């Protein structure tokens, strides 16, 4: 595989990840969001090079998370230009996490080839998501692949059984099987057919369960939740003369929310 092909797959992985999440609404991307990573891992398995696996994984995480988290700089730049440094540190760390995942998955394929990638990848990548969600001040617990399917409510209803992590494992499993089906369609039609059928069957089952839940689940009002956002400027927050005005504004808005309930 040439460097250009690796760069293309890394870039494609970043684009798929970006468009899989809101505000974009392309649910089908959630099922192939890790396809570029799967293609890279298949190549790494054939090479048996764990050092190269970490390198490719680092670039994959660095670029993809750099694209997805672009808003960090946009949102925080007016507070301090140091937000650019924080953004860089964050995506470098994400690259290290992803590099570790590529290294481990390649190592597992080398030492335990009888365990298929559609088993190891969902488990290891979900561990990565858990680590990213518990990374201190730069934690992103909402960045799981399962959260990308929220634009297809009928397909995520079974999260009441497996949670967002369960949805994520399913989507990762689909990515692996779809890539393997595409690779085996020439010469191994039966193998490709059962992989494609397995994905379609799980989507159909998810749809059926979701449709049932959405039509039979009884809803009742439990209360009113109000969000108060006074839009106080960054520099105003540190001005002692503005303290009382800010408190009065918060109290006024809170009373308005309470009156609405």
Describe the role of every protein-language-model region.
Residues 1-216, 247-251, 255:
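Membrane-embedded alpha-helical bundles of multi-pass enzymes
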Residues 210-261:
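Soluble catalytic regions of membrane-associated enzymes that act on cell-envelope
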């Amino acid at each position: 595989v040439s460097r250009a092909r690796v760069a293309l797959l890394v870039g494609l992985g970043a684009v798929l990840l970006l468009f899989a999440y809101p505000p974009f609404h392309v649910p089908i991307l959630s099922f192939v969001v890790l396809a570029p990573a799967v293609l890279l891992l298949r190549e790494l398995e054939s090479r048996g090079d764990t050092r190269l696996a970490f390198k490719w994984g680092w670039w994959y995480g660095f670029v993809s998370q750099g694209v997805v988290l672009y808003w960090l700089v946009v949102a925080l730049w007016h507070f301090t230009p140091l937000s650019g440094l924080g953004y860089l540190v964050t995506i470098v760390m994400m690259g290290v996490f992803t590099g570790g995942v590529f290294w481990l998955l390649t190592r597992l394929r080398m030492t335990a080839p009888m365990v298929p990638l559609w088993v190891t990848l969902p488990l290891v990548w979900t561990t990565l998501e858990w680590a990213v969600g518990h990374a201190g001040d730069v934690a992103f617990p909402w960045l799981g692949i399962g959260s990308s399917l929220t634009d297809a409510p009928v397909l995520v209803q079974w999260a009441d059984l497996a949670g967002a992590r369960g949805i994520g494992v399913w989507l990762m499993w689909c990515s692996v099987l779809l890539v393997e089906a595409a690779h085996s369609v020439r010469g191994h039609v039966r193998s490709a057919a059962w992989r494609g059928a397995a994905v379609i069957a799980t989507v159909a089952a998810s749809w059926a369960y979701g449709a049932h839940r959405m039509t039979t689940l009884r809803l009742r009002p439990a209360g009113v939740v109000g969000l108060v956002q006074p839009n106080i400027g960054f520099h105003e927050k540190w001005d002692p003369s503005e303290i009382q005005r800010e408190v009065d504004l918060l109290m006024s808005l809170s009373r308005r929310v309470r009156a609405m309930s």
